[in-house]
């Protein structure tokens, strides 16, 4: 009787375990439950237009806004916009992309050795490697820009006056090299450009150029993955909530990237190219997903590995850029530190950006 009672107690747990195991097995199959290719195609076309418009609007807000006095790169409102954008980018890396990378690389659908041992956290390793690599690229690129600027900035030599024989020529040479103005004497030496006040602004411009280019690289990588995943789906129930969520996602990321582009002071042509690349990447990814949807199996081992590795690398890049190149730089700015009101506004914008982007993870 006791054994029978014990069996009855254990039976529900066995049924739950069997149900969970079956669900896991089904997740790895390329099922077509809820598939509606025609309905999904309509939603994909809407997604292409919506995400394209949202991304373009986001990146153009800071670019167009720099012509307005309130949104100048050195203005208080722009500080708040940058803090908001940095929060968005940080949440994108930590809340959206990195968890997805861990899910992909620890999926039960992947064949791995080692029995029941815990799988190695490859997502964390790839993310860390990408962050360190970003730091190396950041440093090397900044060094390259500095060296190129130094080669362009040649010191201006003073007029060399050679001393010739004769007291008159010596006195004349001394007169050229030294002038007396109102009781003080100064002599003219070489004009060294690196000691000029413009050096700081040149260094800042170099840093912003590097930051914006590396940041765009990280954003482009995961935008392609997002687009392909959406384009390859054949379930309208999966696509429908993603349309709005990814539109907001692209808009907020565009604001962050646009702010960096504005600070870098790129030429008009470079600014337009970077804005177009960002705006088109996710829609192009959707088109690629549509093209391969008939043969692409999102539940295959290859798909999990590729998606996991690229998401991990993208997360590492975005987390590094948001913390080191955006937040640390701006929040250590003396202008921010001596202005309590601006500090509070920047912190509020940071938490608002990170919070809103994190909320989107409910739907995306």
Swiss-Prot record:
This is Zinc transporter 3. It comes from Oryza sativa subsp. japonica. Glycans are attached at residue 30. One of its GO terms (biological process) is zinc ion transport. It is a multi-pass membrane protein. NCBIfam families: zip (TIGR00820). Expressed in vascular bundles of stems. Zinc transporter that may mediate zinc uptake from the rhizosphere. Seems specific to zinc ions and may not transport other divalent cations. InterPro entries: ZIP, Zn/Fe_permease_fun/pln. GO terms for cellular component: plasma membrane. Residues 1-23 form the signal peptide. It comes from the Eukaryota. It is found in: Cell membrane. Belongs to the ZIP transporter (TC 2.A.5) family. Pfam families: Zip. Residues 24-44, 98-119, 235-241, 293-303 are extracellular. Residues 66-76, 141-213, 263-271, 325-343 are cytoplasmic. The keyword Nucleus does not apply. Keywords: Cell membrane, Glycoprotein, Ion transport, Membrane, Signal, Transmembrane, Transmembrane helix, Transport, Zinc, Zinc transport. The chain crosses the membrane at residues 45-65, 77-97, 120-140, 214-234, 242-262, 272-292, 304-324, 344-364. One of its GO terms (molecular function) is zinc ion transmembrane transporter activity. Induction: By zinc deficiency in shoots. The lineage of its organism: Eukaryota, Viridiplantae, Streptophyta, Embryophyta, Tracheophyta.
């Amino acid at each position: 009787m006791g054994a029978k009672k014990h069996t009855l107690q254990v039976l529900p747990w066995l049924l739950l375990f069997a149900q969970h195991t079956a669900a896991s097995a089904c997740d790895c199959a390329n099922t077509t439950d809820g598939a509606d290719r025609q309905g999904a195609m309509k939603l994909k076309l809407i997604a292409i237009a919506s995400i394209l418009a949202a991304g373009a609007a986001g990146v153009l807000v800071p670019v167009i806004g720099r012509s307005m006095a309130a949104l100048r790169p050195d203005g208080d409102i722009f500080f708040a916009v940058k803090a908001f954008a940095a929060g968005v980018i940080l949440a994108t890396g930590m809340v959206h992309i990195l968890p997805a990378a861990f899910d992909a690389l620890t999926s039960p659908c992947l064949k791995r050795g080692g029995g029941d041992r815990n799988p190695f956290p490859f997502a964390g390793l790839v993310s860390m490697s990408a962050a360190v690599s970003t730091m190396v690229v950041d440093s090397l690129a900044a060094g390259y820009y500095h060296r190129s600027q130094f080669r362009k900035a040649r010191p201006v030599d003073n007029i060399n006056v050679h001393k010739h024989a004769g007291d008159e020529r010596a006195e004349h040479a001394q007169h050229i090299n030294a002038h007396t103005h109102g009781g003080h004497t100064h002599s003219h030496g070489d004009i060294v450009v690196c000691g000029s006040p413009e050096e700081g602004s040149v260094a800042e411009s170099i840093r912003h150029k590097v930051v914006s280019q590396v940041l765009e690289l990280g954003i482009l990588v995961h935008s392609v993955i997002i687009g392909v995943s959406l384009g390859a789906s054949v379930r309208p129930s999966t696509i429908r909530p993603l349309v709005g969520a990814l539109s907001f996602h692209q808009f907020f990321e565009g604001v962050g990237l646009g702010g960096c582009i504005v600070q870098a002071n790129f030429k008009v042509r470079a600014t337009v190219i970077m804005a177009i690349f960002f705006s088109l990447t996710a829609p192009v990814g959707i088109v690629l997903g549509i093209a391969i949807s008939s043969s692409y199996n999102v539940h295959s081992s290859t798909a999990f590995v590729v998606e996991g590795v690229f998401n991990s690398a993208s997360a590492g890049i975005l987390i590094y850029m948001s913390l080191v190149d955006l937040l640390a730089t701006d929040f250590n700015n003396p202008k921010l530190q001596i202005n309590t009101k601006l500090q509070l506004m920047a912190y509020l914008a940071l938490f608002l950006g990170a919070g809103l982007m994190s909320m989107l993870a409910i739907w995306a």
